[in-house]
């Protein structure tokens, strides 16, 4: 089940239409699953009645997914972890399939993912053979359960770990690295690093403080247009990088006003497209007739003219 399906289940179980509350409950359940906490454990550590109610809803949520014979995204790692903890034959079979393991963005792993790693690379008479790539200065997913402590505990859990620092930067100029180091200089450090580059000093970094995202987008579009005219460049020589997709709308509007042609890279996920979710709902219903969210989507899409009787 995707995020929207899970949202619908929680909405039905909580009997509320408060979108913010439903998202908060969805986030709480996800964090508990990623921390490998059962509904009972979540209830035991609840700090107040609101958390206790969320934990009880978590229990009903798990029961509902079980009745649908469905899993959510968090279960895709949590359930294999539970399997490997209790079934040595299954764990051994998968260990033999994996001779080497490469883990990227390790600073953004959560408790469940770290447990999966340990279950796959450790065991009686087994020498761990894996590579973990991570940067403590790039940890940005604590809000969804990621823990930078996983980098620290690696050295404790695997004392023979060999540390290799990749300090040469192949992407940026010296000025960009200096600016980045100034921003992250006060961060708590697990590993001291001295980044350097062979690309020379590079152009100065310009920082503009704008009133809002609309003003920022307008300024970017005007600067791009002026720079192209001065340098007699092509529009294809330019790229605009932004932090999140929520910023794309204002940037697109500004580019259109300046009559700047552009191509969007990325965009909506294939499986998030409405027509794809419609087809998948039919397939899910064929596989499991008790999948209520799939039934509701299938029976209402496309519109068939059915509805409440008119007076």
Per-range role (PLM):
Residues 4, 149-167:
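Conserved P-loop NTPase motor "coupling/switch" region that bridges the ATPase
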Residues 137-142, 171-172, 264-287, 299:
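Short alpha-helix plus adjacent loop in nuclease-associated cores
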Residues 47-153, 168-172:
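Conserved helicase NTPase motor core
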Residues 1-28, 40-49, 56, 60, ...:
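Conserved P-loop NTPase-based nucleic-acid remodeling module centered on helicase motor cores
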């Amino acid at each position: 089940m995707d995020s929207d399906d899970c949202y619908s289940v929680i909405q039905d179980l909580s009997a509320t239409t408060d979108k913010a509350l439903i998202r908060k409950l969805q986030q709480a359940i996800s964090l508990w699953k990623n921390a490998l906490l059962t509904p009972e454990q979540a209830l035991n550590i609840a700090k107040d009645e609101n958390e206790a109610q969320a934990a009880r809803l978590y229990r009903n949520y798990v029961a509902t997914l079980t009745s649908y014979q469905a899993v959510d995204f968090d279960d895709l790692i949590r359930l294999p972890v539970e399997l490997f903890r209790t079934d040595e034959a299954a764990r051994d079979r998968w260990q033999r399939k994996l001779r080497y393991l490469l883990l990227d963005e390790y600073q953004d792993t959560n408790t469940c993912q770290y447990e999966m790693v340990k279950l796959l690379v450790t065991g009686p008479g087994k020498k761990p053979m894996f590579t973990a790539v991570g940067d403590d200065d790039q940890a940005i997913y604590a809000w969804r359960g990621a823990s930078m402590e996983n980098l620290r505990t690696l050295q404790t859990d695997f004392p023979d770990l060999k540390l290799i620092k990749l300090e040469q930067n192949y992407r940026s100029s010296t000025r960009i690295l200096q600016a980045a180091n100034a921003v992250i200089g006060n961060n708590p450090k697990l590993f001291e690093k001295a980044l350097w580059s062979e690309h020379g000093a590079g152009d100065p970094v310009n920082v503009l403080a704008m009133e809002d995202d609309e003003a920022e987008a307008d300024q970017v579009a005007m600067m791009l247009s002026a720079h192209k005219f001065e340098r007699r460049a092509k529009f294809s020589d330019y790229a605009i990088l932004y932090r999140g997709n929520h910023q794309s709308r204002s940037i697109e509007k500004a580019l259109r006003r300046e009559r700047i042609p552009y191509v969007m890279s990325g965009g909506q996920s294939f499986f998030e497209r409405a027509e794809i979710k419609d087809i998948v709902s039919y397939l899910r219903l064929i596989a499991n007739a008790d999948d209520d969210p799939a039934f509701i989507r299938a029976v209402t899409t496309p519109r068939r003219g059915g509805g409440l009787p008119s007076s």
